[in-house]
Amino acid sequence: MLEAARALFTRDGYDHAGVRDVAAIVGVDAALVIRYFGSKEKLFAEAVAQGFDPGGYLEGERSGLGERLARSVLQKEKGDGGGYDPLLALLRSAPNERAAALLREGLDEQFVHPLARWLGGERASERAGLIAANLFGLAFMRAVVRSAPLATGEVEDLVALVAPVLQSYVDGKPSQTTPS
């Protein structure tokens, strides 16, 4: 049920994904979904509780984190891959205040705060927030808006442009890249 809910919230957002839709995918009655989760809001909270964990990206050299994070967004399918994508679930659910609050909590608790602790140093929280903002902006422009330069650009070219900016937040130093 959770896998189906995650995929639906990614594809349709909170407002357009329903308990009946989840039940139909799984092949059960909607009452069973309610029995297990209590409400659509609780199903949503449980479905998106995981997904923002930066743990895997924090493994490896600190000097390569910007590139690893850029790739995490840019190598995803352009559009819907059919599975759970916490970035797209957040973007598509943001118009609903309660859903946005739940996602914001998850993002802060599972991504921004752990990343800030890992980054350390001056203004670590702001730097972690800026990294998250950049990643969400990339995901939004590439997968939702489908802006031509980002949606059709070569992954390696985009990573080469984005990674130094993200790395500057990791290092706590202004980016030295200049547009050409």
Predicted regions and their residues:
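Short alpha-helical scaffolding segments that buttress acidic/His motifs in well-ordered protein cores
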Residues: V73, L87-A94, I131-L135, A139
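Phosphate-rich cofactor/ligand-interacting catalytic cores and adjacent structured alpha/beta frameworks
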Residues: G51
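Amphipathic alpha-helical segments used for helix-helix packing
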Residues: V48, K78-Q110
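Hydrophobic alpha-helical connector segments
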Residues: P54-L88
